[in-house]
Amino acid sequence: MRIGLTSLAFDGKSMPSGIDYVEDVPTKRTSSADDMLGFLHGVDAGQFGTSKFENVCRRALEKWSERGYNSFIYGSPTTRQVPVQSKLGMIQSICRLLPQTSHHKHFLIELLDCQALSDYKTVRQVADAVSMIPNNWSVGVVLDLGEAVRSGMTTSDIINMPRIERFHLRGVDAEEPFDVKRMASQVSLLDRWLDYYDPAVVDLTFESRAADSHYREFIDFADRRWNA
């Protein structure tokens, strides 16, 4: 299992030791990272579903690709109320028009406000369809464990999601000391998935806006629990 952080989880100046990648955000660039990622959304993107939104997203992907980002995650709080079918239609449109790349690029669709299996199956179908486009881009699925817990996902639900490329684990109570017990429900879902599927093919990203000590303690915890 590869372990990563969002750039909001640490000072953002250099790649912390003990992690494999950083998920960058447009407002906070991280240096010295081997695997850089960007979130496909922005304050100037305009209303979701419009041609302006589509064009802004496509230009952002092209720009980040030129800067050396290998992967991109789609998932924005500003679009959570948009029906998943509309989101995926836009994603397909954007990905189909992306230019051919000389190196493999990866686009990840994050499940937000997920309705358990129904959203997963739809997103998986779109990801697989887009991955068939011969332009050296592949598409995968991200499950936000914090959102999964909030929406009532069960361990029975998650074992019916066999192909997930990345999980997001939410930090809890940024002002308090790091406490794995507060994330127990998220960890339980991930452990259940790992009972059935190969940990070698999945990434785990820690999301937190807390002090540096949180990500350091998370790295130690993740290594002991999943990479021992």
What positions do the PLM features span?
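Basic- and aromatic-lined ligand-binding clefts that recognize polyanionic substrates
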Residues: 104-134
